[in-house]
Amino acid sequence: MNANIMTSGQFPDLLRVGIREVFLSEYQMYPELYSKVYDVQTSNRAYEEELIIAGFGAIPEWNSDGSELPTDRALTGNRVLYVHKDYGMMWTVSKRLLREDLYAKIGGELMREAVRAMKHTVELVAWSVIANGFTGTRPLFGNQTLLNGESFSNAISVALTPTGLEQALTRFHRWRNHRGIPVVIEPKQLIVPPELKYVAYTLLHSTYYPNIGSGGNTAPSSTGSAFYDNPFKNVVPDTLCVPYLQDTNDWFLFAAPKVHKLRFYWREKPATDMFTDFRTKGVMHSITGAFSVGFTDFYGVLGSQVS
């Protein structure tokens, strides 16, 4: 017998007369998180391709008394490919389970569990790009080389404290494009693991200056800090608590999804299918999907890796 086929023996309680409901493991699922951070688009090709382009720099002074206009050209960087990957699984319910009318009781729950598994997979893959963004041959966070040859760092290594948040906000206000021109870019989201959720809330919503040390202590201060207004109050509109961030100290400051360059492409949104297996007379189910995720440029995202 195929070990992957669910049989009536796995659900002995269902054979009892009078059973009315079957409950699988129920848990409170987090709402969809990845779409709050990524620019989510739909693709109709095998892959998507994007190119980093820098426009013009400062316009030079020109002698209009018969001299030619100075020339400039756009700068281009590397092409970034988003190659879609397929994800899927199947499961089979035996004929006996169907015949005893047991499947009618658990079929819907099994399908919901499969949908939850797919949702979990999407979140896991999407957040791994951010969580692992400090490492690799092309890191998302670090000392980045601009197309004009200069450099700009979108990474810091400070705990989520007033000092750390101030440093991150200052870095945002010092943002330069690939031509070295200062650009106005506002932080939209403070992204934290569950361990920093209340630290983030204290920083952004307390009325008075937050007393938060490097260890995340939010106890009232005896130094008189409560007499100062909180300069960080509502500076960052949204706080996002993400359980897929495994490091309990790292945190991130992002611009709005339409501003930065993190991409999520749906090639095939999750879909389910079912048919009868003529060999076993059981019912086979499947769930599949295809997508790609990554980043084109580091613009508009900042990460703090705390050792």
Model-based region annotation:
Residues 1-28:
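N-terminal alpha-helical "arm" segments
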Residues 2-11, 146-174, 186-189, 195-307:
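Sequence/fold signature of self-assembling virion shell proteins
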